[in-house]
Amino acid sequence: MPSNKAGIIPRLCLRSAFPSFPVSPLNERPMSSALRPSACPGLLRIVQALDGGICRIKLNGGSITAVQADIVASAAERFASGVIEATNRANLQIRGIGSTHGPLIDSLMASGLGPTTAAGDDVRNLMLSPGAGIDRTMLFDTRPLAERILDTLQGNARFHDLSAKFAVQLDGGESLAMLEHPHDLWLSAFEQDGEKRWAFGLAGCPTDTSAGSVALNDGHALVVAVLDMFLEVARPEQTRMRHLLAEHSREILLNRLAERLSIQAMTDWRRTLDSRPLHIGAHPQAEAGVVYVGAVPPLGRLDPVMLRGAAQLAARFGDGTLRFTPWQSLLLPTVRNEDAAEVIRSLERMGLFCDPDQSLTRMIACTGSSGCSKSLAETKGDALQMAALLKRHGQVLNVHLSGCSRSCAAAHIAPVTLLAVAPGHYDLYFRDAAQPGFGALHARHLTIEAVAALLDARSRSPLDA
């Protein structure tokens, strides 16, 4: 079963955590000796894989300036293989890094993309909607609160004891939101009797039943209270909220929280999921006359030319920023209506997809056996073959190819999952809420051709539910 991923949050440099303009660089890199052992890559911790080192660049709110994006592209060219990945937590990764890490790290730190302390890099994981502050249906602009949370956690060494996988989600009610990634704590804005509040839950998603609600002004206090409670109650081996809930009832934990701030019981609310592919193509923003343009790199991978080109478009036609998304894609915000078509044409010429009817926009695949020793198949290549076969059949399906059971490329359960069992062969699962893990096992040891034929036949069957 896919593991719940990521850690928690502090703040970046002496600047806004959500920049829309070039930033001042840090004067020096945090001391690497303060890094704790972890298998998770970071900006300061380069983790080795079969294809070289991996550097994970955590983006506050998924946002990066055009200047910073150009620096990332140059770093990938100069110090690595040129492979840049958009992750399912709206971050970036550089792959194929050589044995000398210092110049790459220094260039990224100087751009303002790193933490202020080495310990802070592991725990700055706060996921927002890619449409934060610009979505037409948002109830609350989450960016100021997110920046405040990042400030607090970066400045409080106590929160650096959280696992590097501990995760928080802040949902402002946007239509463009990934609501299927489990988090240790989630907050979701809603309106009740004319009052805006935060619904929240522990170890789950906003589409789950909420645990309670707090006043809109208490969002920051709630996050701090939950993290304090977790660190007080959890034993060292209990690194995630789900571990705590396996031993303590939700009611007990909520009672402890109620000692710290006013919580209203609420177990009959859950967030409605908008299943439209709003991260692809041009969509109106809250501000009249402008749109954001969403583009998907093939299987989440960009090369330096793609990233640099998108950054140049953002500087010329947008607000000078790019926003990365949990769908391993990117947005160019604040493009004038009359410029959207030209931006889309330019992105497509670079090799990005802006049409949700293209098969590769719905495909997810991990690194595969060429880059990961745990993968049993070359998932990227197999995904390209699958997309071509589905296109031939006129099918556009959400399919996840995983080289092993860890499901690194997807934090949620896809409608269709192919789990590698040997090179070019997969077990086929269909999502089923009643089944654990990837869902219901439908067939074993299938080739890509066999999977495509089966999916095509299934889509045409009148008996298919």
Predicted features and spans:
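Aromatic (phenylalanine/tyrosine) cluster motif
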Residues: 18-21
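Small-residue-enriched alpha-helical segments and adjacent helix-cap loops
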Residues: 27-33, 52-195, 213-217, 221, ...
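Intrinsic, low-complexity N-terminal interaction/targeting segments
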Residues: 33-48, 114-116
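Flexible, glycine/charged-enriched surface loops at secondary-structure junctions
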Residues: 82-86, 159-163, 231-255, 260-277, ...
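Mobile "lid/hinge" segments at catalytic clefts and subdomain interfaces of large enzymes
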Residues: 162, 166-247, 412, 417-465
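Active-site cores of enzymes that catalyze phosphoryl transfer or operate on phosphate-rich substrates
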Residues: 271-292
